[in-house]
UniProtKB/Swiss-Prot annotation:
Signal peptide region: none
Residues holding ATP: 33-40
Organism encoding this protein: Bacillus subtilis (strain 168)
Protein name, as recorded: Uncharacterized ABC transporter ATP-binding protein YvrA
InterPro entries: AAA+_ATPase, ABC_transporter-like_ATP-bd, P-loop_NTPase
Record gene name: yvrA
CDD domains assigned to the protein according to its UniProt record, in alphabetical order: ABC_Iron-Siderophores_B12_Hemin
Residue ranges occupied by any ABC transporter domain in the UniProt entry: 1-238
Length: 442
Protein backbone atom coordinates (compact mmCIF):
# COMPACT_ATOMS: atom_id res chain seq x y z
CA UNK A 1 0.00 0.00 0.00
CA UNK A 2 1.10 3.53 -0.74
CA UNK A 3 -0.46 6.84 0.32
CA UNK A 4 0.60 10.17 -1.15
CA UNK A 5 -0.22 13.59 0.34
CA UNK A 6 -3.35 12.35 2.08
CA UNK A 7 -5.59 15.02 3.62
CA UNK A 8 -9.16 14.81 4.85
CA UNK A 9 -11.66 14.82 7.67
CA UNK A 10 -15.36 14.97 8.45
CA UNK A 11 -17.53 17.62 6.84
CA UNK A 12 -15.56 20.78 6.19
CA UNK A 13 -12.89 19.98 8.76
CA UNK A 14 -9.46 18.78 7.73
CA UNK A 15 -8.19 16.52 10.50
CA UNK A 16 -5.42 14.86 8.48
CA UNK A 17 -2.85 16.99 6.68
CA UNK A 18 -0.54 15.79 3.92
CA UNK A 19 0.27 12.29 5.20
CA UNK A 20 2.35 9.98 3.03
CA UNK A 21 3.39 6.43 3.85
CA UNK A 22 4.14 3.02 2.37
CA UNK A 23 3.49 -0.48 3.68
CA UNK A 24 5.35 -3.37 2.11
CA UNK A 25 4.30 -7.00 1.82
CA UNK A 26 4.87 -8.76 5.14
CA UNK A 27 5.25 -5.50 7.09
CA UNK A 28 3.49 -4.69 10.37
CA UNK A 29 3.07 -0.91 10.74
CA UNK A 30 1.93 0.69 13.99
CA UNK A 31 0.29 4.13 14.10
CA UNK A 32 0.58 5.91 17.46
CA UNK A 33 -0.27 9.27 18.96
CA UNK A 34 -2.31 11.00 21.67
CA UNK A 35 -6.10 11.12 21.69
CA UNK A 36 -7.42 13.34 18.92
CA UNK A 37 -4.23 13.17 16.88
CA UNK A 38 -6.05 11.66 13.88
CA UNK A 39 -5.07 7.99 14.06
CA UNK A 40 -8.52 6.52 13.42
CA UNK A 41 -9.36 9.20 10.85
CA UNK A 42 -6.19 8.31 8.95
CA UNK A 43 -7.20 4.65 9.03
CA UNK A 44 -10.59 5.58 7.53
CA UNK A 45 -8.86 7.50 4.74
CA UNK A 46 -6.48 4.61 4.02
CA UNK A 47 -9.34 2.10 3.80
CA UNK A 48 -11.62 4.36 1.76
CA UNK A 49 -14.44 4.47 4.32
CA UNK A 50 -13.82 8.23 4.46
CA UNK A 51 -13.16 9.94 1.10
CA UNK A 52 -9.93 11.92 1.01
CA UNK A 53 -10.15 15.63 0.23
CA UNK A 54 -6.66 15.52 -1.21
CA UNK A 55 -4.10 12.87 -2.05
CA UNK A 56 -4.19 9.29 -3.28
CA UNK A 57 -4.06 5.77 -1.91
CA UNK A 58 -2.71 2.88 -3.97
CA UNK A 59 -3.38 -0.73 -3.07
CA UNK A 60 -1.39 -3.42 -4.90
CA UNK A 61 -0.38 -0.77 -7.43
CA UNK A 62 -3.95 0.27 -8.21
CA UNK A 63 -5.81 3.38 -7.07
CA UNK A 64 -8.06 2.56 -4.13
CA UNK A 65 -10.89 4.55 -5.74
CA UNK A 66 -10.75 2.30 -8.82
CA UNK A 67 -11.61 -0.88 -6.91
CA UNK A 68 -15.14 -2.22 -6.88
CA UNK A 69 -16.36 -3.00 -3.32
CA UNK A 70 -16.33 -6.77 -3.81
CA UNK A 71 -12.93 -6.66 -5.48
CA UNK A 72 -11.53 -4.54 -2.65
CA UNK A 73 -12.92 -6.90 0.00
CA UNK A 74 -10.99 -9.77 -1.56
CA UNK A 75 -7.63 -8.16 -0.80
CA UNK A 76 -8.33 -5.85 2.17
CA UNK A 77 -9.90 -6.51 5.58
CA UNK A 78 -10.66 -4.08 8.41
CA UNK A 79 -11.02 -4.78 12.12
CA UNK A 80 -12.52 -1.69 13.81
CA UNK A 81 -12.40 -0.84 17.52
CA UNK A 82 -15.89 -2.17 18.15
CA UNK A 83 -18.72 -3.53 16.01
CA UNK A 84 -22.35 -3.36 17.10
CA UNK A 85 -24.19 -6.62 16.49
CA UNK A 86 -27.80 -5.90 15.53
CA UNK A 87 -28.67 -9.49 14.56
CA UNK A 88 -28.32 -12.75 16.46
CA UNK A 89 -25.92 -14.65 14.23
CA UNK A 90 -23.83 -17.51 15.53
CA UNK A 91 -20.07 -17.22 15.74
CA UNK A 92 -19.61 -19.48 12.71
CA UNK A 93 -22.15 -17.50 10.65
CA UNK A 94 -20.41 -14.24 11.58
CA UNK A 95 -17.00 -15.58 10.57
CA UNK A 96 -18.47 -16.97 7.35
CA UNK A 97 -19.43 -13.44 6.27
CA UNK A 98 -15.74 -13.00 5.59
CA UNK A 99 -16.12 -15.34 2.61
CA UNK A 100 -18.97 -13.31 1.09
CA UNK A 101 -16.74 -11.45 -1.43
CA UNK A 102 -15.68 -14.81 -2.90
CA UNK A 103 -19.14 -16.34 -3.25
CA UNK A 104 -20.77 -16.48 -6.68
CA UNK A 105 -24.08 -17.54 -8.13
CA UNK A 106 -27.64 -16.61 -7.34
CA UNK A 107 -27.72 -18.18 -3.87
CA UNK A 108 -24.07 -17.48 -2.95
CA UNK A 109 -23.53 -20.82 -1.27
CA UNK A 110 -20.37 -21.63 0.65
CA UNK A 111 -17.90 -23.97 -1.04
CA UNK A 112 -15.96 -26.74 0.72
CA UNK A 113 -12.84 -24.60 0.40
CA UNK A 114 -14.65 -21.65 1.94
CA UNK A 115 -15.90 -23.76 4.84
CA UNK A 116 -12.36 -25.01 5.48
CA UNK A 117 -11.06 -21.43 5.50
CA UNK A 118 -13.76 -20.39 7.98
CA UNK A 119 -12.91 -23.33 10.26
CA UNK A 120 -9.20 -22.51 10.10
CA UNK A 121 -9.85 -18.84 10.94
CA UNK A 122 -11.94 -19.84 13.97
CA UNK A 123 -9.23 -22.21 15.19
CA UNK A 124 -6.51 -19.62 14.67
CA UNK A 125 -8.36 -17.11 16.85
CA UNK A 126 -9.58 -19.57 19.49
CA UNK A 127 -13.32 -19.22 18.83
CA UNK A 128 -14.03 -22.65 17.32
CA UNK A 129 -15.20 -24.07 20.66
CA UNK A 130 -18.22 -21.76 20.69
CA UNK A 131 -18.91 -21.74 16.93
CA UNK A 132 -22.66 -22.33 17.40
CA UNK A 133 -23.10 -19.79 20.16
CA UNK A 134 -24.89 -16.49 19.37
CA UNK A 135 -22.31 -13.75 19.12
CA UNK A 136 -24.41 -11.40 21.26
CA UNK A 137 -23.88 -13.74 24.23
CA UNK A 138 -20.10 -13.35 24.08
CA UNK A 139 -17.94 -10.95 26.04
CA UNK A 140 -16.38 -7.94 24.33
CA UNK A 141 -13.02 -9.68 24.09
CA UNK A 142 -14.56 -12.83 22.63
CA UNK A 143 -16.48 -10.79 20.07
CA UNK A 144 -13.27 -9.04 19.05
CA UNK A 145 -11.66 -12.41 18.37
CA UNK A 146 -14.68 -13.45 16.28
CA UNK A 147 -14.38 -10.35 14.12
CA UNK A 148 -10.67 -10.99 13.68
CA UNK A 149 -11.57 -14.49 12.50
CA UNK A 150 -14.03 -12.92 10.05
CA UNK A 151 -11.29 -10.65 8.73
CA UNK A 152 -8.86 -13.56 8.38
CA UNK A 153 -11.52 -15.59 6.56
CA UNK A 154 -11.27 -12.99 3.78
CA UNK A 155 -7.63 -14.07 3.34
CA UNK A 156 -6.66 -10.44 2.75
CA UNK A 157 -3.35 -9.18 1.45
CA UNK A 158 -3.54 -6.24 3.85
CA UNK A 159 -5.26 -6.02 7.23
CA UNK A 160 -6.22 -2.77 8.98
CA UNK A 161 -6.83 -2.80 12.74
CA UNK A 162 -8.00 -0.04 15.07
CA UNK A 163 -6.75 -0.69 18.61
CA UNK A 164 -7.36 -4.45 18.26
CA UNK A 165 -6.43 -5.37 21.85
CA UNK A 166 -8.76 -2.92 23.63
CA UNK A 167 -11.18 -5.53 24.98
CA UNK A 168 -8.75 -8.42 25.38
CA UNK A 169 -7.05 -9.69 28.51
CA UNK A 170 -3.28 -10.10 28.49
CA UNK A 171 -3.24 -13.70 27.27
CA UNK A 172 -5.52 -12.99 24.31
CA UNK A 173 -3.68 -9.75 23.49
CA UNK A 174 -0.53 -11.79 23.12
CA UNK A 175 -2.29 -14.55 21.16
CA UNK A 176 -3.86 -12.06 18.74
CA UNK A 177 -0.67 -10.12 18.08
CA UNK A 178 1.42 -13.29 17.87
CA UNK A 179 -0.99 -14.55 15.21
CA UNK A 180 -0.87 -11.33 13.18
CA UNK A 181 2.91 -11.23 13.43
CA UNK A 182 3.14 -14.86 12.34
CA UNK A 183 0.88 -14.20 9.34
CA UNK A 184 3.00 -11.23 8.25
CA UNK A 185 6.12 -13.35 8.52
CA UNK A 186 4.84 -16.60 7.00
CA UNK A 187 2.08 -15.50 4.61
CA UNK A 188 3.28 -12.06 3.57
CA UNK A 189 0.23 -10.34 5.08
CA UNK A 190 0.67 -6.58 5.40
CA UNK A 191 -0.84 -5.16 8.59
CA UNK A 192 -1.55 -1.57 9.65
CA UNK A 193 -2.76 -1.03 13.20
CA UNK A 194 -3.59 1.89 15.45
CA UNK A 195 -2.17 1.42 18.96
CA UNK A 196 -2.44 3.24 22.26
CA UNK A 197 0.11 1.04 24.02
CA UNK A 198 3.61 2.14 23.04
CA UNK A 199 5.34 -0.95 24.40
CA UNK A 200 3.05 -3.39 22.62
CA UNK A 201 3.54 -1.56 19.34
CA UNK A 202 7.29 -1.47 19.84
CA UNK A 203 7.46 -5.21 20.49
CA UNK A 204 5.36 -6.34 17.53
CA UNK A 205 5.67 -3.76 14.77
CA UNK A 206 8.35 -3.54 12.10
CA UNK A 207 7.79 0.19 11.73
CA UNK A 208 6.15 2.92 13.81
CA UNK A 209 4.66 6.26 12.80
CA UNK A 210 3.67 8.91 15.34
CA UNK A 211 0.83 11.36 14.75
CA UNK A 212 0.13 14.70 16.40
CA UNK A 213 -2.49 17.30 15.45
CA UNK A 214 -3.29 15.54 12.18
CA UNK A 215 0.28 15.35 10.89
CA UNK A 216 2.49 12.28 10.79
CA UNK A 217 6.17 11.86 11.42
CA UNK A 218 8.36 9.52 9.38
CA UNK A 219 8.00 5.76 9.57
CA UNK A 220 10.88 4.39 11.63
CA UNK A 221 12.01 1.15 13.20
CA UNK A 222 11.00 0.95 16.88
CA UNK A 223 14.66 1.15 17.89
CA UNK A 224 14.82 4.67 16.42
CA UNK A 225 11.23 5.80 16.97
CA UNK A 226 10.77 5.00 20.66
CA UNK A 227 13.07 7.42 22.45
CA UNK A 228 12.52 9.62 25.47
CA UNK A 229 12.85 12.73 23.31
CA UNK A 230 10.39 11.62 20.62
CA UNK A 231 7.77 10.44 23.12
CA UNK A 232 8.00 13.69 25.09
CA UNK A 233 7.60 15.69 21.86
CA UNK A 234 4.51 13.74 20.79
CA UNK A 235 2.76 13.18 24.13
CA UNK A 236 4.03 16.21 26.11
CA UNK A 237 4.96 14.11 29.13
CA UNK A 238 8.11 12.81 30.78
CA UNK A 239 8.99 9.16 30.26
CA UNK A 240 11.96 6.86 30.73
CA UNK A 241 13.23 4.48 28.05
CA UNK A 242 14.24 0.98 29.14
CA UNK A 243 15.83 -1.99 27.42
CA UNK A 244 13.74 -5.15 27.06
CA UNK A 245 15.48 -8.21 28.51
CA UNK A 246 14.90 -10.49 25.53
CA UNK A 247 14.36 -8.11 22.61
CA UNK A 248 16.20 -5.13 21.10
CA UNK A 249 12.90 -3.24 21.05
CA UNK A 250 12.85 -0.30 23.52
CA UNK A 251 10.26 -0.01 26.28
CA UNK A 252 8.78 3.17 27.78
CA UNK A 253 7.62 3.82 31.35
CA UNK A 254 5.87 6.96 32.56
CA UNK A 255 7.29 9.11 35.35
CA UNK A 256 4.86 9.69 38.25
CA UNK A 257 4.84 13.10 39.89
CA UNK A 258 7.57 13.22 42.50
CA UNK A 259 6.73 13.48 46.19
CA UNK A 260 7.06 17.11 47.24
CA UNK A 261 8.06 16.07 50.76
CA UNK A 262 11.83 15.86 51.04
CA UNK A 263 12.90 12.46 52.27
CA UNK A 264 15.39 12.21 55.08
CA UNK A 265 18.62 10.32 54.58
CA UNK A 266 18.49 6.68 55.62
CA UNK A 267 20.70 5.93 58.67
CA UNK A 268 22.27 2.81 57.19
CA UNK A 269 24.69 2.31 60.10
CA UNK A 270 21.87 2.35 62.64
CA UNK A 271 19.81 -0.13 60.60
CA UNK A 272 22.60 -2.67 60.19
CA UNK A 273 22.05 -5.90 62.15
CA UNK A 274 24.84 -8.46 62.32
CA UNK A 275 25.64 -11.79 63.93
CA UNK A 276 27.60 -14.98 63.27
CA UNK A 277 25.04 -16.25 60.75
CA UNK A 278 23.75 -13.18 58.93
CA UNK A 279 24.19 -9.50 58.16
CA UNK A 280 20.85 -7.78 57.58
CA UNK A 281 19.69 -4.30 56.61
CA UNK A 282 16.05 -3.44 55.97
CA UNK A 283 14.50 -0.12 54.92
CA UNK A 284 10.94 1.15 54.68
CA UNK A 285 11.49 2.70 51.26
CA UNK A 286 12.79 0.52 48.40
CA UNK A 287 16.36 1.03 47.24
CA UNK A 288 17.41 0.92 43.61
CA UNK A 289 19.99 -1.88 43.47
CA UNK A 290 22.53 -3.42 41.13
CA UNK A 291 24.22 -6.56 42.35
CA UNK A 292 25.93 -9.81 41.47
CA UNK A 293 24.10 -11.57 44.29
CA UNK A 294 22.40 -14.96 43.75
CA UNK A 295 19.01 -13.45 44.61
CA UNK A 296 18.15 -10.01 43.25
CA UNK A 297 20.94 -10.04 40.66
CA UNK A 298 21.07 -7.25 38.10
CA UNK A 299 18.94 -4.15 38.50
CA UNK A 300 16.03 -4.33 40.93
CA UNK A 301 14.30 -2.54 43.82
CA UNK A 302 14.92 -3.97 47.27
CA UNK A 303 13.89 -3.29 50.85
CA UNK A 304 15.96 -6.12 52.31
CA UNK A 305 19.72 -6.66 51.94
CA UNK A 306 21.05 -9.81 53.54
CA UNK A 307 24.24 -11.86 53.69
CA UNK A 308 23.39 -15.33 55.01
CA UNK A 309 25.67 -18.03 56.38
CA UNK A 310 24.83 -21.38 54.80
CA UNK A 311 26.74 -24.66 54.44
CA UNK A 312 28.02 -25.49 50.96
CA UNK A 313 25.18 -26.86 48.83
CA UNK A 314 24.86 -28.45 45.35
CA UNK A 315 22.56 -25.63 44.28
CA UNK A 316 23.41 -22.46 46.27
CA UNK A 317 20.56 -20.40 44.81
CA UNK A 318 17.95 -23.04 45.61
CA UNK A 319 19.30 -23.43 49.15
CA UNK A 320 19.38 -19.68 49.78
CA UNK A 321 15.89 -19.27 48.33
CA UNK A 322 14.48 -21.98 50.58
CA UNK A 323 16.20 -20.53 53.66
CA UNK A 324 14.91 -17.00 53.06
CA UNK A 325 11.38 -18.18 52.24
CA UNK A 326 11.23 -20.22 55.46
CA UNK A 327 12.36 -17.12 57.38
CA UNK A 328 9.52 -15.04 55.90
CA UNK A 329 11.52 -12.76 53.59
CA UNK A 330 9.80 -11.43 50.45
CA UNK A 331 12.14 -12.58 47.67
CA UNK A 332 10.83 -10.07 45.13
CA UNK A 333 12.18 -7.21 47.25
CA UNK A 334 15.34 -8.88 48.56
CA UNK A 335 19.00 -8.84 47.52
CA UNK A 336 20.73 -11.81 49.13
CA UNK A 337 24.17 -13.41 49.12
CA UNK A 338 25.52 -16.42 51.00
CA UNK A 339 28.79 -17.63 52.55
CA UNK A 340 29.75 -20.78 54.42
CA UNK A 341 32.01 -18.91 56.86
CA UNK A 342 31.05 -16.92 59.95
CA UNK A 343 29.85 -13.37 59.25
CA UNK A 344 30.45 -11.49 62.49
CA UNK A 345 33.73 -9.97 61.30
CA UNK A 346 33.22 -7.03 58.97
CA UNK A 347 34.18 -3.39 58.44
CA UNK A 348 31.82 -0.49 57.77
CA UNK A 349 32.13 3.27 57.45
CA UNK A 350 29.98 6.22 56.33
CA UNK A 351 31.54 8.82 54.02
CA UNK A 352 29.90 12.22 53.54
CA UNK A 353 30.08 15.16 51.16
CA UNK A 354 27.48 17.77 52.04
CA UNK A 355 24.01 16.26 51.66
CA UNK A 356 25.45 13.13 50.02
CA UNK A 357 26.56 10.11 52.00
CA UNK A 358 27.86 6.66 51.13
CA UNK A 359 27.78 3.71 53.52
CA UNK A 360 30.35 1.00 52.72
CA UNK A 361 30.45 -2.42 54.35
CA UNK A 362 33.11 -5.05 53.56
CA UNK A 363 32.19 -8.53 54.74
CA UNK A 364 33.38 -12.14 54.70
CA UNK A 365 34.91 -13.09 51.35
CA UNK A 366 35.41 -9.38 50.72
CA UNK A 367 31.80 -9.02 49.68
CA UNK A 368 31.01 -5.32 49.40
CA UNK A 369 27.88 -3.28 50.05
CA UNK A 370 27.87 0.33 48.83
CA UNK A 371 24.71 2.16 49.91
CA UNK A 372 24.13 5.69 48.63
CA UNK A 373 21.97 8.40 50.15
CA UNK A 374 21.43 10.20 46.86
CA UNK A 375 20.45 9.75 43.24
CA UNK A 376 22.39 7.60 40.78
CA UNK A 377 21.64 6.99 37.10
CA UNK A 378 21.78 3.39 35.88
CA UNK A 379 25.09 3.96 34.11
CA UNK A 380 26.59 5.21 37.36
CA UNK A 381 25.58 2.00 39.14
CA UNK A 382 27.64 0.09 36.59
CA UNK A 383 30.58 2.47 37.01
CA UNK A 384 30.35 2.14 40.80
CA UNK A 385 30.35 -1.65 40.63
CA UNK A 386 33.37 -1.61 38.32
CA UNK A 387 35.15 0.91 40.56
CA UNK A 388 34.56 -1.26 43.63
CA UNK A 389 35.92 -4.31 41.84
CA UNK A 390 38.95 -2.33 40.66
CA UNK A 391 39.71 -1.08 44.19
CA UNK A 392 39.35 -4.61 45.58
CA UNK A 393 41.77 -5.97 42.98
CA UNK A 394 44.20 -3.11 43.60
CA UNK A 395 44.34 -3.86 47.33
CA UNK A 396 44.13 -7.67 47.28
CA UNK A 397 45.50 -8.58 43.86
CA UNK A 398 43.82 -10.82 41.29
CA UNK A 399 41.66 -13.47 42.94
CA UNK A 400 42.07 -11.92 46.37
CA UNK A 401 38.36 -11.33 46.80
CA UNK A 402 35.55 -13.18 45.09
CA UNK A 403 32.55 -12.06 47.13
CA UNK A 404 29.50 -10.42 45.60
CA UNK A 405 29.20 -6.65 45.16
CA UNK A 406 25.97 -4.75 45.81
CA UNK A 407 25.31 -1.11 44.93
CA UNK A 408 22.13 0.55 46.27
CA UNK A 409 20.77 4.10 46.22
CA UNK A 410 17.80 5.92 47.71
CA UNK A 411 17.27 7.78 44.39
CA UNK A 412 16.70 11.09 46.20
CA UNK A 413 18.62 14.35 46.49
CA UNK A 414 19.73 15.05 42.93
CA UNK A 415 22.67 17.42 43.30
CA UNK A 416 25.21 19.20 41.12
CA UNK A 417 28.25 17.15 40.08
CA UNK A 418 26.69 14.22 41.92
CA UNK A 419 28.46 11.50 39.93
CA UNK A 420 31.90 13.01 40.41
CA UNK A 421 31.34 13.49 44.14
CA UNK A 422 29.90 10.01 44.64
CA UNK A 423 32.72 8.45 42.65
CA UNK A 424 35.32 10.09 44.90
CA UNK A 425 33.54 8.89 48.05
CA UNK A 426 33.20 5.34 46.72
CA UNK A 427 36.82 4.98 45.58
CA UNK A 428 38.22 6.41 48.81
CA UNK A 429 35.86 4.50 51.08
CA UNK A 430 36.13 1.16 49.30
CA UNK A 431 39.93 1.22 49.37
CA UNK A 432 40.04 2.13 53.08
CA UNK A 433 37.46 -0.46 54.13
CA UNK A 434 39.05 -3.27 52.12
CA UNK A 435 42.49 -2.54 53.61
CA UNK A 436 41.05 -2.58 57.13
CA UNK A 437 39.09 -5.76 56.40
CA UNK A 438 42.21 -7.48 55.05
CA UNK A 439 43.98 -6.80 58.35
CA UNK A 440 40.93 -7.95 60.33
CA UNK A 441 40.50 -11.19 58.40
CA UNK A 442 44.18 -12.11 58.85
Amino acid sequence: MKAEGLSGGYGDSRLINNVSLTVEKGEFLGILGPNGSGKTTLLHLLTGTLPAKKGRVYLAGKLLADYKPKELAQIMAVLPQKMDQAFTFTVEETVAFGRYPFQTGLFRQQTEKGEAIVQEAMEQTGVADFAQKPIRELSGGEQQRVYLAQALAQQPRILFLDEPTNFLDLAYQKDLLDLIKRLTRESGLAAVSVFHDLNTASLYCDGLMFMKNGTAGPKQKPEYAVTEQSIKAVYDTDVTALVHQSSPKPMIVIQPEKDSVKRQSIPFEALLQAGRDDILLQTEIPLRTLSSTPIGAGFSWSRTLIHKRLPDQPDPIEGLTACLSESGFQLQETCAMASSERLDRFVYRTYEDGELSVFICVQTGFSIWILINGYAADQFFIKALMAAEAERTKVLGDGGGTGDILIAATQTQQSENIEQRLNQLIKKGTAECIKEAAELFE
